[in-house]
Amino acid sequence: MDSARPATSLTHPDEPAFRAWLRALSHAFDHDFEGDLGSPGGRAFLLATFTDNGAVPAPYFAPLVDEHRRVHAERVVAALLTRARRDTGRVFDVPVRHEWSDAPDGIGRVFVGHEPVEGLDPVSMAVAAAEGVQCHLADRELLVWPLCPDHRTGPHATRTPDGAAWVCSVTHHVVAPVPS
């Protein structure tokens, strides 16, 4: 599923069958999937999934969400660990793991370190993955990374109007983007 393709090749978000599918998924998972249309990344995932697979029932949709979250988390972690190696000269390993849902046919959970990666939007997933990397390095390596170059403090991964970013905890300026 390629969510980076032109929007013109995707199902229109007001298509009645698409909206009915979202309502069915929302009921099955007790989650407002129509609310996920408010984020560009969530909308792209849902439209691409419907376009590519049709109105798949909940048990077949759940693994698609699991894979979507895992792939995004792994990409962000790989990019951040490359950056951490460049900044520190050290090689780190931060686990990305998936746990199956306790509910039959439910959506599983993805974790970076101990941080859950939830939602459908790549920016939100990038923020959670970055927090997971940062906490894991602090807990396991006793390392504050990344550092704000102006204040030598650890910034916080935050959603900004421009996407995921490391934001200084002292003056709230953007230190660096977080890949998403």
PLM feature segments, named:
Residues F111-S180:
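Cys/His-clustered metal-coordination modules, chiefly Zn-binding fingers
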Residues R5, H12-E15, V56, V94, ...:
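Intrinsic-disorder/low-complexity coil detector
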Residues M1-T88:
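General detector of N-terminal leader/presequence modules that precede the first folded domain
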Residues T49-A129, V133-R140:
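Charged, alpha-helical interface segments at or near domain boundaries
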Residues H12, H27, H31, H68, ...:
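Histidine (H) residue identity feature
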